[in-house]
């Protein structure tokens, strides 16, 4: 409106000037000519007819008409409702050279917005833009467990920065190389009773993993290889390939993780994956780089490292994960009998210093060729970071506590024991670890250990006597209903971590059992190497029939305890 009032005043001023010009046309004409030009002659006209318009007058009338149109246009704009139209950039301001007058019309043109206007978008397009704006303004749901730094957890990788990442692929490389010194000096360099350590007085590649995570358009997949000792030792602990054909142990021998799935943008995320994935029953990771110790206690070492099946990871909040499983069996590539296994994990992290984990397993028939024997197991852990002061030399401290209970019933055994169904077949154990970090996490010290009681030995790792596996069994260490087994261990671990991608680890372990179980100086390999069927006695030289008697049978050297030292280099990118 102010622009309109200003234009109205200018318009009145021009009218006054025009009136004066009409009253004295000769003066106006003289002003338009050069001062040296001769005076113009007046034109003849009828006495009552109007005088003819000069060129200057016609120009001024044209300018007045343009001004009237501009004023009308301004009035229509000021009275029209606001529309979501985009106005083109205003004309550049009129610049005048010093001493050169600026006409009123030019001033009005410069002051008014440009007449070039982009038409308003259709209502549908406007609505779409508004919807996109609303979606952009909507709060983004927090990523699960991203609210704090959980690299301190036992079983979690401590790397905080990815070495390399793309929109489609996040690579991962792991190397685990160790040297173990067994104080009993077994002559065949074989170590029994562990799912992490296998040879003595030798440098061995426990695992070389190459792979990573694929992720694009909500589709996900993961691959991790297991070259090295794991490719032999992990499959030999699974008896399910003995049922049926196609050599499942060989088919999966060189992969530790292999699955594909889809991510749903619901709640705080839902992942559906199928294939081989880590179980984390027993808290410790399958990969030693992620753990506080190299040799975990029995509660971890004797429980599943992987499952083959389908999992659904549901994140209702950024603090909670609920993960049901449908799997072939208890750390198995296939089924042992006619029934698969079912389980679930619940993980709750309310803040940055507390993690509560529960793994439950049920209904699987996991004893080979024994249908009707059903397994149940619960594995529950709590981890607390009770000290955190980065400015001190000892900058962090935390502990983990894990408790496990389980049993089997049916097929000649019972959970309680002392019944007509059979002897007690159960598992009870715990482990506790305390870790300290020093010098901004460059050094770590862990003390821990645990204890188990497993009558029936259904979760005891079978010693590799004469090449025995979970499929063959061995008469030298039976796993029959009612067979007793109690064990305990303690360890001390020192880590030097000059980079977040490497750990130099020194560890001492003492392990013991109530029955001869660990490899002694005589080893667990017959003279000259494995001899005959692994599930049978090995006869002494020159004897064709043997029954386990020392007079006719070769006997492995098994002891009730072991002491060993381990040095390992662990790498993860």
Segments (PLM) and residue ranges:
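Glycine/serine-rich loop-strand microenvironments at binding/catalytic pocket rims
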Residues: 95-138, 216-239, 243-246, 315, ...
């Amino acid at each position: 409106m102010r622009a309109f009032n200003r234009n109205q005043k200018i318009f009145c001023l021009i009218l006054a000037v025009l009136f004066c010009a009409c009253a004295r046309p000769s003066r106006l004409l003289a002003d338009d000519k050069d001062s040296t030009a001769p005076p113009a002659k007046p034109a003849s006209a009828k006495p009552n007819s109007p005088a003819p318009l000069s060129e200057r007058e016609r120009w001024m009338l044209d300018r007045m008409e343009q001004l009237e149109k501009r004023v009308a246009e301004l009035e229509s704009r000021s009275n029209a409702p606001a529309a979501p139209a985009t106005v083109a950039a205003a004309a550049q301001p009129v610049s005048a050279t010093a001493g050169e007058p600026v006409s009123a019309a030019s001033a009005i043109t410069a002051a008014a917005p440009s007449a070039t206007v982009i038409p308003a978008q259709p209502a549908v397009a406007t609505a779409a833009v508004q919807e996109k704006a609303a979606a952009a303004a909507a709060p983004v749901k927090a990523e699960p467990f991203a609210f704090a730094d959980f690299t301190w957890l036992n079983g979690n990788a401590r790397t905080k920065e990815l070495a390399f990442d793309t929109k489609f692929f996040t690579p991962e490389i792991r190397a685990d190389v160790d040297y173990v010194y067994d104080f009993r000096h077994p002559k065949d360099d074989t170590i029994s009773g562990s799912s992490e350590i296998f040879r003595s007085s030798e440098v061995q590649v426990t695992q070389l993993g190459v792979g990573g995570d694929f992720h694009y358009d909500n589709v996900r997949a993961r691959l991790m290889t297991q070259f090295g000792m794991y490719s032999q030792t992990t499959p030999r602990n699974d008896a399910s390939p003995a049922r049926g054909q196609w050599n499942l142990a060989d088919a999966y021998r060189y992969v530790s993780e292999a699955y594909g799935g889809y991510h749903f943008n619901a709640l705080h995320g839902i992942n559906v994956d199928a294939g081989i994935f880590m179980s984390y029953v027993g808290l410790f990771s399958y990969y030693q780089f992620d753990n506080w110790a190299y040799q975990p206690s029995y509660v971890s070492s004797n429980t599943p490292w992987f499952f083959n099946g389908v999992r659904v990871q549901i994140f209702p909040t950024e603090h909670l994960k609920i993960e049901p499983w449908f799997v072939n069996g208890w750390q198995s590539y296939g089924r042992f009998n006619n029934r698969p296994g079912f389980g679930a994990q619940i993980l709750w992290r309310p803040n940055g210093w507390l993690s509560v984990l529960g793994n439950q397993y049920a209904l699987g028939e996991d004893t080979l060729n024994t249908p009707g024997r059903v397994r149940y197991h619960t594995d529950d852990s709590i981890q607390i970071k009770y000290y955190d002061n980065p400015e001190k030399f000892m900058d962090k401290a935390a502990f983990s506590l894990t408790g496990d209970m389980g049993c089997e019933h049916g097929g000649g055994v019972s959970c309680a024991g002392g019944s007509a169904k059979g002897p007690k077949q159960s598992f009870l154990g715990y482990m506790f670890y305390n870790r300290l970090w020093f010098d901004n996490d460059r050094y770590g010290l862990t003390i821990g250990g645990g204890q188990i009681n497993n009558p029936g030995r259904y979760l005891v790792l079978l010693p590799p006597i004469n090449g025995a596996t979970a499929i063959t069994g061995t008469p030298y260490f039976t796993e029959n209903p009612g067979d007793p087994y109690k064990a305990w261990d303690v360890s001390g671990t020192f880590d030097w971590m000059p980079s977040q991608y490497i750990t130099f680890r020194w560890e001492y372990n003492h392990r013991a059992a109530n029955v001869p179980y660990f490899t002694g100086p005589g080893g667990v390999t017959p003279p000259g190497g494995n001899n005959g069927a692994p599930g049978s006695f090995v006869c002494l030289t020159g004897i064709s029939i043997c029954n386990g008697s020392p007079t006719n049978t070769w006997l492995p050297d098994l002891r009730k305890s072991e002491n060993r030292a381990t040095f390992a280099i662990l790498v993860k990118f």
